[in-house]
């Protein structure tokens, strides 16, 4: 099953991506090779091979929750570009109706 440039354009549009004609051709070629490899894997006879959903034998390995000292607050605050009332001040990324965002 080959993939077409139209299919790649469609997926790119859904992903809000845009490609040049050269990039489109490159991605189409790469995706076509990937599909060929998957089709090749589908032909492998796995009869008698046990199903494994997790190859790692460890199950629910937990560690004790231990509090450890963090970085010294004064040392940390020396490295921040801007602070206010003991907190690190960062630029607003959402506008909630207040000035500055």
UniProtKB/Swiss-Prot annotation:
Its EC number is 6.3.5.-. It comes from the Bacteria. Keywords: ATP-binding, Ligase, Nucleotide-binding, Protein biosynthesis. The keyword Transferase does not apply. One of its GO terms (biological process) is regulation of translational fidelity. InterPro entries: Asp/Glu-ADT_sf_sub_c, GatC. Heterotrimer of A, B and C subunits. Belongs to the GatC family. HAMAP family: GatC (MF_00122). This is Aspartyl/glutamyl-tRNA(Asn/Gln) amidotransferase subunit C. It comes from Enterococcus faecalis (strain ATCC 700802 / V583). The lineage of its organism: Bacteria, Bacillati, Bacillota, Bacilli, Lactobacillales.
